[in-house]
Design a protein with these regions (language model features):
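Gly/Pro/Ser/Thr-rich low-complexity, intrinsically disordered segments predominantly at protein N-termini
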Residues: 1-210
C-alpha cells in the first residue's frame, strides 16, 4: 500500500513543512485564489476549512442550528458591545501572530468598526471570542483554546451544541496555552460577561438554547 504525505506527517517521518504566513494568506485572497468570506482559517501556518456542520454531516454543510445560535449571540451582545465601547464581528478573521488567522464565530473587539478599516484585530484588541461547536467541539476545546489563551484573550466562550451547554474559559495562561478557569453553564443558569470598560451583561443559557 502506498504511503501519502499525510501518513508520513502522522507518523512523524515527513519532511519539514513550510508554514503559510498571514501576509501570504491575505495575498491569496487579494489574488482571487480564495474568496473573501470563504470558510478558510489559517491555523499554525496551515489552511483549514472551518467546520460549521453537525455531527455526521458533510463538512461543507452549514448546520442551521449553528447559524441560529450565532444570530442569537449577535442579538444578545449587540447592545452591550455598544455600551462597552466595543465592536461585534461575526465570522471575520482575527490575526494572532504571523501564522494564525482564525475566524471565530463571534468576536468582541475594542473600539469601532472604523478602527479596523485597514487591518484585522490583533491580540491587544480582543475582549471575548466565541465558537459555536457541534462536530468541531474537540478542535474548539483544544486548538482554539490554545490559540486564544496564548494570545491573552480574556474570555473564550464555547457554545456546546450537542449538550446545550455554554463553556466559559477565563484567566488565560500564555505559557501553557490554556485557561486556568473553566466553568460549564446549563439551562436555568446565567453567564456573566464583564467587559473591561463597563458594567457586566448576564446571558440566560435557557434563552440561548431554547
Amino acid at each position: 500500500m502506498s504511503t501519502t504525505l499525510l501518513d508520513e506527517l502522522s507518523g512523524g517521518t515527513a519532511p519539514p513543512l513550510v508554514p503559510i504566513t498571514v501576509e501570504q494568506f491575505q495575498q491569496m485572497i487579494l489574488n482571487g485564489i480564495f474568496q473573501d468570506g470563504d470558510p478558510i482559517e489559517l491555523i499554525d501556518g496551515l489552511l483549514v476549512r472551518k467546520d460549521r456542520s453537525a455531527r455526521g454531516e458533510h463538512l461543507m454543510t452549514h448546520n442551521p442550528r449553528h447559524a441560529l445560535l450565532v444570530s442569537r449571540l449577535q442579538r444578545f451582545l449587540m447592545s452591550a458591545c455598544e455600551a462597552a465601547g466595543c465592536y461585534l464581528r461575526i465570522q471575520i478573521p482575527v490575526v494572532l501572530g504571523s501564522i494564525n488567522a482564525p475566524e471565530p464565530d463571534v468576536a468582541v473587539v475594542r473600539g469601532t468598526e472604523e478602527d479596523y478599516a485597514d487591518r484585522h484585530p490583533g491580540p491587544a484588541d480582543l475582549e471575548l471570542m466565541i465558537e459555536v461547536a457541534d462536530s468541531s467541539l474537540g478542535t474548539d476545546r483544544s486548538t482554539k483554546q490554545r490559540l486564544y489563551a496564548t494570545a491573552g484573550v480574556p474570555q473564550y466562550w464555547l457554545v456546546n451544541l450537542p449538550e446545550s451547554q455554554l463553556e466559559v474559559y477565563e484567566q488565560p495562561d500564555a505559557a501553557t496555552g490554556k485557561y486556568a478557569r473553566k466553568t460549564i453553564h446549563a439551562a436555568g443558569q446565567t453567564v456573566a460577561w464583564n467587559p473591561s470598560t463597563t458594567q457586566r451583561l448576564d446571558l440566560s443559557v435557557t434563552d440561548l438554547f431554547r
